[in-house]
Amino acid sequence: MNILFVRLSYIGDILHATPAARWIKEHYPEAKLHWIVTPSMVELLKNNPYVDEIIPWERDEYEAHSKKLHIPTMWRMWWELRDKLKPYKFDVAVDVQGRLITGLVLLASGAPIRLGLGGTKELNWLFTNYKAKPSTDHVIKRYIEVAELLNTAVTEHSDLNVSSAVSEDNVKPCITNGAAGKKLYHMDFFVPSDLQVWAEEQWKSISYDTSLERSEVEKPLRVGLVLGTSWATKEWPQEKWYSLIKSLQYRANFVCLGGLKEATQYKPLMDSLTADGLDKIMLNMLGKTTLQEVGALIESCDVVVTADTGSLHI
């Protein structure tokens, strides 16, 4: 059984969808799960044992043309996507994004069985023939409920090439409490061992302060600071970041994480830290890391302080 899993973007949303992909592979291990995603997000799914193949598609480019009503270009890109997906001969497509653009991806997949969210907007409901009930539950639970529709689809389509897929365990509702519930809901992001080693090397490059106060700390805490966010209303003032670092200067080392935007935006903060000698206990990684490297650095931290942004979910 070939399955196309559709969650195109962005960091937090894709990570929230990983439990649903894992549910599918754990309940239907013989199925091949292909995840279609925006190219810039591919790294989030690398090394994920529950994803057999990552299919990149220029979702952002398509949306840009959509906003400008470039109909010929949109039509061309859709047909190119259709031609790209056709050789896979998908049996099932699973859409946990629920937008018009993902509905068009379902249509391009050619899959006869199309699972999706209930209560969606942008006409997405036109493209799915199995829908989860509308819900206000946590998004991870809602995504898993879409995946669980596969049980119903398999029982109704005997032509699907699935052996012993549906059992009593499969058709139980998703668990929502206790240790099993935590396992069900945990998000997947896999950091390879070579990047774990790389992260350790970054910490070793910090020049330790040899002051009396500092020397009393046997092993400073490793604190990750994710400085930026996409929304100005969610920003923490730069002077607050400075105060946090200053207050912990004798107890911690820091790594600053963010993209190229943050490298420019937070230059005043970096300059202030340098002027006060605090750069000696700081790794400035703004605009210097891939998503996998961000994951490795976050994994190596004791504490992470972050704005409401993608790396929060990592």
Regions found by a protein language model. Give the residues of each.
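Catalytic machinery of carbohydrate-active enzymes
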Residues: M1-I314
